[in-house]
Amino acid sequence: MTGGLAIVGLGPGDAALVTPQVTAALALASDIVGYGPYVDRIPPRAGLTLHPSDNRVELERAQHALEMAAEGRRVVVVSSGDPGVFAMAAAVFEAVESGPQHWRRLQIDVLPGITAMLAAAARVGAPLGHDFCAINLSDNLKPWALIEKRVRLAAEADFAMAFYNPRSKARPDGFARVLKVLNDACQDNRPVIFARAVSTPDEAIRIVPLPEATPDMADMRTMVLVGTSATRLIARDDVPFVYTPRSVPARSGFE
């Protein structure tokens, strides 16, 4: 049997948002590897072995998947959202680079998925309609000073921003520091979108002006989107539409 490895994104939660390409790869898999809650999204079937693991063993998980693929198994590594956005694709290639030479000859495919920032943005309109950046606010794998620097520079450049992993029980104070950086740098009422558990039954959307945003509005299941100085709200009876215009006037202070 010829083995191989697919690194796939399961999207934000709704099964309807899993791509046909990913669905086909899962149907052919002999082994599924991933963080426990993501593996739990895969229905068991005959001939399929599930390998759930903790969220702090990404490199070990990648190495295990590569070892099985080298043995001829059809392995799928699952991530939520897109596998190349703060997810397992980078960990797999890190393992390939530092591992045995024969891993470099394996068939390895990265199959994209719908990442949380795009699902969240779609719920309210087009807040990422112009230049934007995505920042992971977890300091598990990078120093906090770097996070603050990137947030400050993005705010000063007037990017729209998407924040992954804004707050957790282990990191209760970091998001408060981010909000302070934003308020100091922006000093305006640009909208902040808190999109929790998008595309699941627990979905909740909240939009507030930046000065009114508070840390307790976010948790690990929340995607936070911050608009630019040009981002607009269109009022309506339900949640307003939010969009960032695609053009920037010549006299915008950034000449």
Give the location of each predicted region.
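Class I S-adenosyl-L-methionine
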Residues: M1-L111, T214, A250-F254
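A short acidic, often aromatic-flanked loop/helix-cap motif at beta-alpha or helix-coil junctions
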Residues: R56-R61, A116, N140-K142, S199-D202
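A contiguous loop/helix-start segment that scaffolds small-molecule binding in enzyme catalytic cores
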Residues: L5-I7, R74, E156-E255
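Loop/helix-junction capping segments adjacent to catalytic residues or to phosphate/diphosphate-binding pockets
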Residues: A16, L59, F86, L141-W144, ...
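Class I SAM-dependent methyltransferase SAM-binding "motif I" and its flanking Rossmann-like core
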Residues: G3, V85-A157
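Structural signal for conserved beta-strand scaffold positions within catalytic alpha/beta enzyme cores
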Residues: G34, P52, V110, C133-N136, ...
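Solvent-exposed alpha-helices and their adjacent loops that cap or buttress functional pockets
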Residues: M1-T2, A24-A25, M68-A70, V77, ...
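Short, active-site-adjacent cap segments at secondary-structure transitions
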Residues: V39-R41, G84-F86, M117, S199-D202, ...
